[in-house]
Amino acid sequence: MAPYSLLVTRLQKALGVRQYHVASVLCQRAKVAMSHFEPHEYIRYDLLEKNIDIVRKRLNRPLTLSEKIVYGHLDDPANQEIERGKTYLRLRPDRVAMQDATAQMAMLQFISSGLPKVAVPSTIHCDHLIEAQLGGEKDLRRAKDINQEVYNFLATAGAKYGVGFWRPGSGIIHQIILENYAYPGVLLIGTDSHTPNGGGLGGICIGVGGADAVDVMAGIPWELKCPKVIGVKLTGSLSGWTSPKDVILKVAGILTVKGGTGAIVEYHGPGVDSISCTGMATICNMGAEIGATTSVFPYNHRMKKYLSKTGRADIANLADEFKDHLVPDPGCHYDQVIEINLSELKPHINGPFTPDLAHPVAEVGSVAEKEGWPLDIRVGLIGSCTNSSYEDMGRSAAVAKQALAHGLKCKSQFTITPGSEQIRATIERDGYAQVLRDVGGIVLANACGPCIGQWDRKDIKKGEKNTIVTSYNRNFTGRNDANPETHAFVTSPEIVTALAIAGTLKFNPETDFLTGKDGKKFKLEAPDADELPRAEFDPGQDTYQHPPKDSSGQRVDVSPTSQRLQLLEPFDKWDGKDLEDLQILIKVKGKCTTDHISAAGPWLKFRGHLDNISNNLLIGAINIENRKANSVRNAVTQEFGPVPDTARYYKQHGIRWVVIGDENYGEGSSREHRALEPRHLGGRAIITKSFARIHETNLKKQGLLPLTFADPADYNKIHPVDKLTIQGLKDFAPGKPLKCIIKHPNGTQETILLNHTFNETQIEWFRAGSALNRMKELQQK
């Protein structure tokens, strides 16, 4: 042992590599399961180490943590071309997670593939289809009744194909992943844009569309454009009213909603140790709002503490042995560096209408007065996948206790969403839930609820101007309640609680006083709460369905008359010709998020039925021609009508069409319906100034052409009444622009260039009609 250990040490020094534990160099001494639910699926730190060593020798430089985990999962580390921001990496993720709104389409596609079982550990989580109305138990019962067909499909499909199934009421996908599946060094993909939440436990967890998930479940290497790495150095320490949420609210204000596009945000520095594991998850979760591929923190004692408290001390011990691979190398290079002194950071609140409009809480009241935003807060809402941990609930309860001690309750309506059944049961046991009820709160079901528009709001009418404050992640127009006049702000749960008690945006809990029931003034003290329960977590009800060992007799039925589920028909292949005389369905003015393209809320019930869900295509996008939403000119009849109706008219009459968009088109959710719908209704291309990462990939997967103006000013050359011809598809090649001929009604023409990011594999998707079609072609060879 000694001579070999010495040899390894000398070799590492010669290569400029940090010295590793002898145990990790030799072998993985003990097999440790990835989760309690999959006892025969093991963590492969030995393979991670081997791949990192291969890549390190090739690159001959220190590696960031992001690079270690990503490159450590390369399909072919010895030969993979690696260049940040340019090359496409072929990766082997460790697992897949899907929420119920996206799992329907993902499983329908997997069924279409003809494969018998998933190739990697996979889970389905029921959290998106539960509407908030009356409170937890009643809303859950109603959801089970309304969504019985969908839940039965997902449960039986999971059983048939080897996918774990978390029943409705189990909690929000990302909290369940953090509690059970995420671990340092994991590469996990999830069909939800807030999958990066797992970065709080040291994993690279990336939001993708369902077609990407199908690739991984089918055992096909997953492609990701080699990400750049943005370093955020944290110094100082959090204290007082400042919370982990304020870190990402500050970063969002710096980088904006697209500043992280194509990059992993990697937090490091001495300030990291002052943040709890669930606090790190909060920061990583909301990294989706800056367009980041994902975010990650280095493994530390806070993660070890969380792993141990959630029954995974064996994983923590193994991570300790391999810790050198779970932190960045000294001297590693970041493409951009931001430094934040946590000791100087103030509580923030971002909004309205965009998550990157950052304000210190101390200033938002005066800004609101100046801008004409409603000062009175109608509703305060805490929870969501971003902020529903035990610590979040504890800090909010600490604020509420102070108000109750002075005889006060919330002036605003107040709702609480526990992140999981485990969190719900534990805060009930420890008294937090009752304190939050006593101050005026309603505890909702363990689900997404109002955060994704599942909110049957009764206190206002549509079009009524009002303000809400949430601890959620997104505040796009109409996202939470479908009211475009709701001014939504995002902040930490404790600030939401304080503002709900005060009832106004003008209240600053750091400096302002409240008046108690006895008429005496008092100031709220900064909340203090345990990051983890002192006793063990209470798991609550058992909500997990294991896939059976033998599923040969399992049936998965989809009724041909169902309004909720629809088996998929393959999209048509490319006909080998250029796209001639495309009609412009809509030229979008300004921001066009995934909520504008295909809203959630009441439309979630159609996520498994492509034709029905297509009836909401682009109904939120603003038409530049008339400055209206869901009103576009039919080029044949010359009448204005809803976008989906016009698209269906074009499809019925054999008219192919295109969408023209602005900057960061498709920011927001990972749901691939935003790509499936335009493809289903006859769309062929989306041309914009720039795309959000996930949406661009989703469009490619479904055989559409996401293209960008070589000169962004060319956006202004195109008018809604023009026709477009896209040339160069016969010689379609990576890095080679396509030509676009703009044909104006007066007979004049202009030619512009359109860029794309297709690689060879993705071009094959286009030619086959979709990535799924291409998968079937390869299976038949």
Curated annotation (Swiss-Prot):
GO terms for biological process: tricarboxylic acid cycle. It catalyses: citrate = D-threo-isocitrate. Substrate binds at residues 99, 192-194, 474, 479, 607, 670-671. The modification Pyrrolidone carboxylic acid is found at residue 28. Keywords: 4Fe-4S, Acetylation, Iron, Iron-sulfur, Lyase, Metal-binding, Mitochondrion, Phosphoprotein, Pyrrolidone carboxylic acid, Transit peptide, Tricarboxylic acid cycle. Pfam families: Aconitase (PF00330), Aconitase_C (PF00694). The modification N6-acetyllysine is found at residues 50, 138, 144, 233, 517, 523, 573, 605, 723, 730, 736, 739, 743. Pathway: Carbohydrate metabolism; tricarboxylic acid cycle; isocitrate from oxaloacetate: step 2/2. Its cofactor is [4Fe-4S] cluster. Residues 524-537 have a biased composition (Basic and acidic residues). Its EC number is 4.2.1.3. This is Aconitate hydratase, mitochondrial.
